[in-house]
């Protein structure tokens, strides 16, 4: 990597709350199946090992999220207190970034994208799946918009 390329990257450290993301994921699930009876909802999903699935997909989706915003993960540290420290290298004007807002949007993205991946093996309806896809896209657009601000 040449020096000009290195100068375009900035380091950003963000602390994400895994429990908050898990709660957001469950809220997304409630939204997707809102108004359905228990028989109509994809209950196979509820019978899955959600905490286990969440842990695996969460770490995968962190990498996906970072590549989508034009950066890469330098370091991830999952602490016992439920926080994940992510040190990112991203290409963006970093001066005016609202860290609280971008953290919330990242949590939104991770919650919706992890849930979307959980839905793939179960019998969710096309509408439910499209709702999750649109919510992940909306969160990612918001992240990119925040990072693009000078």
Spans of features found by a protein language model:
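Elongated alpha-helical scaffolds
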Residues: 105-113, 117
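Conserved short "hinge" loops at termini or chain/domain junctions
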Residues: 1-99, 126, 133-150
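Mixed-charge, glycine-accented linear interaction segment located at domain edges/termini
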Residues: 117-126
